[in-house]
Amino acid sequence: MKASMFLALAGLVLLFVVGYASESEEKEFPRELLSKIFAVDDFKGEERGCKGFGDSCTPGKNECCPNYACSSKHKWCKVYLGK
């Protein structure tokens, strides 16, 4: 009887500790998420010298990034397949 009470109490303590730890991690999650969003936002502020997929371009000017080509039909950069 004493052993089962001890195990039940130990289980409750373990459950409390795990719940507290996961709750404290959840409180830190929004801060980490916001810091990552702002870090990505800072990266987007830098301008590239070339145009990426779906950006408008002028055929024949070679404005698209490597592995992309300006489509003469649609006038936007798309993946260059080598044809």
Curated annotation (Swiss-Prot):
Primary localisation category: secreted
Stretch forming the signal peptide: 1-21
Tissue expression summary: Expressed by the venom gland.
Localization: Secreted
Top-level taxon: Eukaryota
Residue runs in coiled coils: none
Keyword Repeat in record: no
Pfam family, one: Toxin_12
A Gene Ontology molecular function term of the record: ion channel inhibitor activity
Residue ranges annotated as propeptide in the record: 22-48
Leucine amide modification, residue list: L81
Keywords: Amidation, Disulfide bond, Ion channel impairing toxin, Knottin, Neurotoxin, Presynaptic neurotoxin, Secreted, Signal, Toxin, Voltage-gated sodium channel impairing toxin
Cysteine pairs bridged by disulfides in the record: C50-C65, C57-C70, C64-C77
GO CC annotation terms, alphabetical: extracellular region; host cell presynaptic membrane
Note: Negative results: has no activity on Nav1.4, Nav1.5, Nav1.8 and Nav1.9 sodium and calcium currents.
Family assignment from sequence similarity: Belongs to the neurotoxin 10 (Hwtx-1) family. 15 (Hntx-3) subfamily.
UniProt remark on domains: The presence of a 'disulfide through disulfide knot' structurally defines this protein as a knottin.
Record's subunit section: Monomer.
Its biological purpose: Selective antagonist of neuronal tetrodotoxin (TTX)-sensitive voltage-gated sodium channels (IC(50)=1270 nM on Nav1.1/SCN1A, 270 nM on Nav1.2/SCN2A, 491 nM on Nav1.3/SCN3A and 232 nM on Nav1.7/SCN9A). This toxin suppress Nav1.7 current amplitude without significantly altering the activation, inactivation, and repriming kinetics. Short extreme depolarizations partially activate the toxin-bound channel, indicating voltage-dependent inhibition of this toxin. This toxin increases the deactivation of the Nav1.7 current after extreme depolarizations.
Protein name listed in UniProt: Hainantoxin-III 1
Species of the source: Cyriopagopus hainanus (Chinese bird spider)
